[in-house]
């Protein structure tokens, strides 16, 4: 996702343009916006509300320079999983202000407790969305550097942006063909990650242990993450 997030911001931003980024955030999103000449404007994700985005805070931070909003769902670093109704509110705001949506969904296969992951692009067929995912987390092969970005929705709104992406992508000359040869097998074959995210599985049990250990410390609280084993406490 890192290379593609950098690519996606470089193709979009002029100096001074703004992108809404969640806080707390995966810091490389802020870095990619900054490196592209933009300004990362952080919107609040509130622990008291299961770490969901504060929609009113998002609205307050939109200006005439705002070009896009980034969401990370499932979230890194909080482990929050955004429900359909929260995603719909974000879509409504993006539609009203004509914002592009960038959705980092690299943890979408690591959802626990029978919760459902909803891709925000499925709720916004009329908007231009860029969705990121890959095999690093779900298949535990980060060293292969296999990831992808999916452009969906109203591509007429992103014609110039797509041209910019193609130009920047061509500068890479070639992809990692040997690594890419495993994608079909990885996605279509046996999915071992399912054993890790259920009771008895390593990721599930790590989450349970750390969640309890944190909350057992006086003065420390943590919201139980719904995806992978990350957590943020206070």
What are these regions, as identified by a protein language model?
Residues 1-2, 233:
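Short, small-residue-biased leader/transition segments that mark boundaries at the very start
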Residues 184, 200-211, 221-231:
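Conserved glycine-rich beta-strand-loop-beta hairpin in the small C-terminal domain of fold type I
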Residues 122-201, 211-213:
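Conserved core segment of the aminotransferase class I/II
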């Amino acid at each position: 996702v890192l290379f593609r997030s950098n690519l996606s911001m470089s193709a979009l931003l002029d100096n001074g343009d703004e992108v809404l980024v969640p806080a707390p955030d995966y810091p490389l999103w802020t870095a990619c916006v900054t490196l592209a000449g933009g300004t990362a404007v952080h919107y609040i994700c509130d622990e008291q509300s299961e770490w969901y985005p504060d929609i009113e805070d998002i609205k307050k931070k939109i200006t005439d320079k705002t070009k896009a909003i980034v969401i990370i769902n499932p979230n890194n670093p909080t482990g929050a999983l955004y429900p359909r109704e929260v995603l719909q509110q974000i879509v409504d705001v993006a539609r009203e202000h004509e914002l592009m949506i960038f959705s980092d969904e690299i943890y979408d296969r690591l959802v626990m407790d029978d919760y459902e992951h909803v891709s925000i692009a499925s709720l916004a067929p009329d908007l231009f969305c860029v969705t990121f995912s890959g095999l690093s987390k779900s298949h535990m092969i980060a060293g292969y550097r296999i990831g992808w970005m999916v452009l969906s929705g109203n591509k007429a709104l992103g014609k110039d942006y797509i041209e910019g992406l193609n130009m920047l992508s061509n500068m890479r000359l070639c992809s990692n063909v040997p690594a890419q040869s495993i994608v079909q097998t990885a996605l279509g074959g046996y999915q071992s990650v399912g054993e890790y995210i259920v009771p008895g599985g390593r990721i599930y049990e790590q989450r349970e242990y750390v969640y309890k250990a944190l909350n057992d410390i006086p003065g420390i609280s943590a919201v139980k993450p719904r995806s992978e084993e990350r957590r943020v406490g206070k």
